[in-house]
């Protein structure tokens, strides 16, 4: 325990800030509260990025209601790999990554074989807000599956690593992987 505290203090002395401090001391102070719904929703963020000319994974479709779940076969078509995400999820919770498809079943990136019904259940769980910030009703987005380059294999854990550049008052102040 004391070793962990020592390590944390050493990192802090080097100017390395943890995510908790960032979230507590900087996010509320430098971001307008009324803009949170834009950045907390992956669908809105993706649409804004596209409008700004930023390349993002192709979005195949959005499911907003239980009734729309029956549109899943139409949305994914013949694609053998895709990703389903909660629009307002955080920390990777609720994300289902399909790597292959065969004989009416799907294979996740972890190697688990699941049925179409299990995917529908996951979509339903997303819509009820099981994975959303604050537990509110949500939407599911289905999009292109990004496969990371092998260079990231030794430094990333579960999922596709993303590189984030944190900009404060117009200046890049930190980055994270």
Regions found by a protein language model. Name each.
Residues 3-6, 37, 153:
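Generic detector of short alpha-helix boundary/capping microenvironments
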Residues 1-18:
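Conserved oxyanion/phosphate-binding beta-strand-loop segments in alpha/beta enzyme cores
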Residues 22-132:
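A conserved helix-loop-beta module that forms one wall/lid of the active-site cleft
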Residues 17, 70-74, 166-167:
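Short alpha-helical interface elements
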Residues 110-177:
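Phosphate-binding site of ATP-dependent enzymes
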Residues 1, 17, 59, 169, ...:
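Detector for methionine-enriched segments
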